């Protein structure tokens, strides 16, 4: 927890730009079929009202995962604060085999103790599956709640939780001197802040694997430029500003390289920069357009979009040489892929019969599953644990963010109130 707090502390440097118009998750499909679970409001052991609803945060996280359906508070058979107070039969009668209980206690120094227990209602009374406690200051209460959610989620699913992650996205506001903003928020839309404001378009944010930097495209110099911004202090490093197009940045998983697309020689081609030396080398060539790189886990292989066969399709290629291999064959065109951290599957924008949706392709079997059902879907980005995809779609006259689980069952929107939202990028674990 202490290490995680140190990693996240850099974001506080930018909180002076926190905005009141935030995005919030609105679930549209899939919770009813998820596993039921009990999450009891955490007992507040101080005067007045609790400073944060930790139990509510845990319940929302588990619901947002698409894998759990927390029992509505009005239906809770009891409100225990400890495992010893849980009456297993009261919960099992409702089909619930796991209950989260906890307490929030204020300390004299202004900090708070957060404690939780995950209780098995199918075992002997008081059987604890997982438990932990944290001492945090007020500004880290939500983070502590997400930490508890991560631990509960992993214990029950065997999958690492991703509730302490963030998303970056571009917002085009309605006028003003700087109508384009690159923003970052918690995965659930809370704690939103502005990373960069610009009078010109901003595009294609991409996270470094340690979560400390964002690469993105800016047009402030009068032409496109690729930059890397350090979130803790706001410092900006220009990576590429060649004639024509500079775009589609992607950090390698080992953090040593940045792949991107340039059209300085005519067609779009892929290049890779060694971030330590600044040396750039060309990876693809020819007359076809090659863009939208995404890395495989080995940090040596790229998947990318190419029109070498006519329409855009996804190919893969080792950056040290060899021929590109086409890996998408279903649909009229496929593009803008994001490979999972284990390299077993990818998500992409797939077009067929005039429809443009987010699809998942198994990289072992080649099987394809369409995940989304929204309109003109684009720019999919995977959560680091591979369970969820965030993407943008058209709605009305604007663009909004959406979530869909990688099994296609859970769907949600993240509507914003102050502009069009696009180009989402899900952070690594923080």
UniProtKB/Swiss-Prot annotation:
Residues 1-21 form the signal peptide. Its main location: periplasm. It is found in: Periplasm. InterPro entries: 6-blade_b-propeller_TolB-like, PD40, Tol-Pal_TolB, TolB_N. One of its GO terms (cellular component) is periplasmic space. Keywords: Cell cycle, Cell division, Periplasm, Signal. One of its GO terms (biological process) is protein import. Belongs to the TolB family. HAMAP family: TolB. Part of the Tol-Pal system, which plays a role in outer membrane invagination during cell division and is important for maintaining outer membrane integrity. TolB occupies a key intermediary position in the Tol-Pal system because it communicates directly with both membrane-embedded components, Pal in the outer membrane and TolA in the inner membrane. The Tol-Pal system is composed of five core proteins: the inner membrane proteins TolA, TolQ and TolR, the periplasmic protein TolB and the outer membrane protein Pal. They form a network linking the inner and outer membranes and the peptidoglycan layer. This is Tol-Pal system protein TolB. It comes from Salmonella choleraesuis (strain SC-B67). The gene is tolB.
